[in-house]
Amino acid sequence: MLLTFAPIFLLISSIVAAPTLQLQRKGLEWDYQNDKIRGVNLGGWFVLEPYITPSLFSVWSNGEDDLNTPVDEYHYTQKLGKETALSRLEAHWSSWYTEADFAQMKYLGINAVRIPIGYWAFQLLDNDPYVQGQVKYLDQALEWCRNNGLYAWVDLHGAPGSQNGFDNSGLRDSYKFQDDDDVKVTLEVLKTIGAKYGGSDYEDVVIGIELLNEPLGPVLDMDGLRQFYQDGYSEIRNNDGVESYNAIIIHDAFQQTDHYWDNFMQVSGGYWNVVVDHHHYQVFDQAALELLIEDHIKTACNWGTTHKDEAHWNIVGEWSSALTDCAKWLNGVGHGARWSGNYDNCPYIDSCLSYTDLSGWTDEYKTNVRKYTEAQLDAWEQVGGWFFWCWKTESAPEWDFQALTNAGLIPQPLNDRQYPNQCGY
């Protein structure tokens, strides 16, 4: 959930033909060519993120520093031990989401959910501290989708060794995913996911399997990542002789070059129903945080224009309404906010005190959030749609679809516009 900021005044070049129909061996339940996903991410459920559910982590905080606070799920389970960790996480898995959430999503116009899950839910490495039991609740979530007329992506959010070093991969500050043994385990996990969720038992609900969330291209071997994508595709497409027809989702790996993936895994090479996943935030870069609201909007609109001309079907699988990085632990346990000058020697912009609770937001800030949200909705629907990150949090309102909707800052209905035609499409 980190890392993209493109210069807003970058000229959009290399225009190519609009996406063409992708070869389908069998009609998909979802029409990626013509329909729009309007979805939310179920963040912080099966992969812990301290800023989404700080209550799970704050028991170690003394109010002055975070020295004893685990920084991710790996260290959370390691610190507790398997028995206590399982007890606490079972309580979390069974309560953080209920069917009432899914019913409310449907009521608000949501038609799909993206469900992050780590490799450790399916297979453990030797000496892994992680605990298992998530799959039962994943199955329950898919049944709740079925009951409420929602579709789902199953998203492999964390790979062994970590693919990006983010806390949301399960293991922070590690980049060892491309070690041979870790790639092997990741492919085995994809085979397991594909065999169960890519087959006929779930084809009415699961409309995509994401091979890996946010591999950090700038620190990875991109040739190796491309090979992994091809191998992962094969693991799901042809699983013990049973062919899966589901959409295969590949993340863009934060490659900033326009149309980077256009010539990869194309129909002409025998690949079909491939979708590219883009994630867009404008708060993880000092220059982005300092932009005027008009420039935030222009950036989002430019992304929408660029994505519209890509060769592959594509979705914006993560985005938010955030204009600050003020949410506690958003940048990781032990890190402050760039906005307040408490992260990596960043210059001070403003205090975070008025941004961490909706009740403290000024009318001007609420207007800016609504404008920015509407512009992003318009931009992402230039292509195949979107998944907002995320449905709910404990105390991070800029990232909380439920809270923002209740405050009138996400449109209801979703196509309502107080600030129409901001992108000029």
Curated annotation (Swiss-Prot):
GO molecular function per UniProt: glucan exo-1,3-beta-glucosidase activity
GO cellular component, one term: extracellular region
Disulfide bonds: 301-423, 326-352
Location (main, coarse): secreted
Subcellular location: Secreted
Family membership: Belongs to the glycosyl hydrolase 5 (cellulase A) family.
Main EC class the enzyme belongs to: hydrolase
Descriptive protein name: Glucan 1,3-beta-glucosidase
EC numbers, comma separated: 3.2.1.58
Signal peptide feature range: 1-17
An individual GO BP term: cell wall organization
Active site location: 214, 328
Keywords: Cell wall biogenesis/degradation, Disulfide bond, Glycosidase, Hydrolase, Secreted, Signal, Zymogen
Record keyword Electron transport present: no
Keyword Cell wall biogenesis/degradation applies: yes
